Amino acid sequence: MALQTPVLSPATPTVMAESALYRQRLEVIAEKRRLQEEIGAARRELEEEKLRVERLKRKSLRERWLMDGAAEGPERPEEPASKDPQSPEGQAQARIRNLEDSLFSLQSQLQLLQSASTGAQHRPAGRPAWRREGPRPLSQSAMEAAPTAPTDVDKRTSLPDAPVGMSPESPSDPREESIAVLPASRPSTEAIGTSSEANGPCPGHSPLPEQLSLGVSSVTKAKGDGAVEVVWAGLRATENSATGPTDVELEAKVEEVVLEAIGARQGTSSPELPTWVKEGRGVVEVVWEGLGGRDLDVTGESGRDAEATHTSSRRLQEQFEAETCRKEEGASRDSLEGVGQGGPGVEEGSFIWVERVALSEDWEEILMEGLEAPQGAGSAGEPEALIGAQPRGGEASWEVEKREVEKVEGIEEKGRAEKLGAEREDGVAVLPDETQGREENEAEKVERKDSEGPFPAEIATDEEKWEVKTTEGEESLEVEKGGEAEPVTTEKPLVTEKKPEGSLETERKGSEMPLDQEKDGEGSLDRESKTTEILLDGEIGDKSSLDETKGSKKLLDEKTGGEGSLDEEAEGSKKLLDREADGIEPFSEVDKTSGAKDDVSPEEQGKANEGAEFQAEDASPPGATVCVQDEPRSEEQGQQEPEKQEGLVEGAASKPEPCTEREGPPGDATLLLAETPAPEQPVESQPLLHQEASSTNPGDHPAPTYAPAQQLELAEAKEASGPKQKTCQCCVVM
């Protein structure tokens, strides 16, 4: 055969080697042409045989019909032909089978030859026959039929190494060649969990490897405690994400990964549970760590599928602050929010998005309610709410989902909101001395904390929250009327409202500072609000929660700038309060932009004193409110009215902390979780999922007796109006 030229050893002179290779190439071309001609002849003969058989069948059928006088069915004519090999039809069928076999053997020879001429250069010499492994089930017979096949295998390594495009010959059947190539590439892609296919099409430049550090790899774990944890480790942006992937690329990646992890994603309109939801599960917790941007709508869609999206309030607040600051200052900050493009409408910072979804028999009802806002608005609006301080209709849908979840959870969150108010009161103390750098660090770390989980103090006081919730559910209703409703963290806007307008604005600016620098340069207020917010998470609940707040502050310090001293813990408690204030502040900032901010604060101050915080928390997603709400509020309620104004404003100023406080899956943020848990408090150390499970399932705690429907309605109205921020919550509720 053509390939039987002697194998060239490396010692052969280059001139002789080139001539031999050229000769080999010519021989291969000639052999290919011969095989192609044989294949063409065999195909023509096969077609002729088939036509002949058809004619014979029709002829026999006609004869039988004439003989019998009636067509008794096409079956009878076929039977004798199939049973009698001597009949012309039987002989034709046998010839057809032989022709098909010979044609297949010729095709396999040609394929082997092509792989020898083009595939040897792709493979090491030790594996010359790799192409024969997958594509041809009948390759064995082909090898037997081709006497030169063994020599082909032996000589294949000596074939030319020129690129495939250089060889003039073209495969007779491109499909055969492609079939041969595919199996070679498949094993590697299958072995690697994240193949380019899974990540979806990347229209533009692909993100740098350090930016998508782990590749877009999603780990979905079914936890024994009844929660599903989906951790997106791959889309986490590193500090130098300025050159990060564009929104379109990220959208494609996130969409592919989400679809892959969730399986069959179902729209909000579909009543049945998604395939990834199992009946016995009470809580589904999804942590999105990735690059922020308009592409969040993909994740938002998945969240809607899960019946409601609980996004960590702190992260939303941070992003609101970042975007408002960008609009006002037109510059991107060093914080994670500012790492990406500094455009006012786009935020490309790293975010950790924790979705906590409560699954219950109310699934259908909640899904239908989620439809109150158009699906498009939900998908596009949720990300916008997360990304920027520009309130949008999407936020309304986002909040509607939250309200649905809240209904499932019952009044749990109302109690938490009340606790939030108390926490804020306790953490009224503000530390103006903290520096902007520290605030920025805190903001960045707060973002991470988002998914890490609520502070241990919050977990510990979850039951207390329930008790306070029942007693203070009414207060939460009042608060809803009085307090501004942030799409994510209503509680914080309430705090802001309670404070004087001037202080509110200052604190809001302060909360913006950590993310995007203060609008007015009031760094001290921002620091104060952040510090107070930090305390709010752990300390507001009780005086005893001071220890918890210290632990939480330590966590904050670890993330913010390593401020771990006990003195700083005291400051940290203040920071917690401030951070809660920051959570409100994003909305207050929005109010500033809209011009209604000042108006809202005075009106809401009075109402908020009564219990605006409680309702704000109710309106806010259970996860977001949980962080602050978890603190026991019964003790703090007494202090709430006097301290609320200060604490609330501070809470609004420190937006990032609420997110941190907000529960994140215990292992949500790979790095963040380790930082967040406070070793001091065993309750805090408990995984957030447990807390969430208890909070999400009203059955775990006695359901409050006061009418939840009205409160939910108030929360819904509040949430719907919250994103717009153009009218105060009290006016909206009225």
Curated annotation (Swiss-Prot):
Family: Belongs to the paralemmin family.
Phosphoprotein as UniProt keyword: yes
Post-translational modification as stated in the protein's UniProt record: Palmitoylated on Cys-728 and Cys-730 and prenylated on Cys-731; which is required for membrane association.
Lipid attachment in record (S-farnesyl cysteine): C731
Protein name: Paralemmin-3
InterPro entries xref list: Paralemmin, Paralemmin-3
Record-level Gene Ontology MF annotations: ATP binding
Ligase in keyword set: no
Modified residues (Phosphoserine): S139, S158, S167, S170, S172, S270, S332, S335, S451, S601, S721
Coiled-coil annotated residue ranges, if any: 19-64, 90-116
Propeptide regions on this chain: 732-734
Function statement: ATP-binding protein, which may act as a adapter in the Toll-like receptor (TLR) signaling.
Entry membrane topology: Lipid-anchor
Record-level GO cellular component terms: cytoplasm; plasma membrane
Region Disordered, annotated ranges: 62-100, 114-217, 297-347, 374-400, 413-709
Superkingdom assignment: Eukaryota
Subunit structure: Interacts with SIGIRR.
Example GO BP: regulation of cell shape
Residues with lipidation of kind S-palmitoyl cysteine: C728, C730
Biased composition (Basic and acidic residues): 73-82, 297-308, 315-336, 413-427, 435-452, 462-484, 494-531, 540-561, 571-582, 589-607, 630-647
Protein source organism: Mus musculus
Gene name linked to the record: Palm3
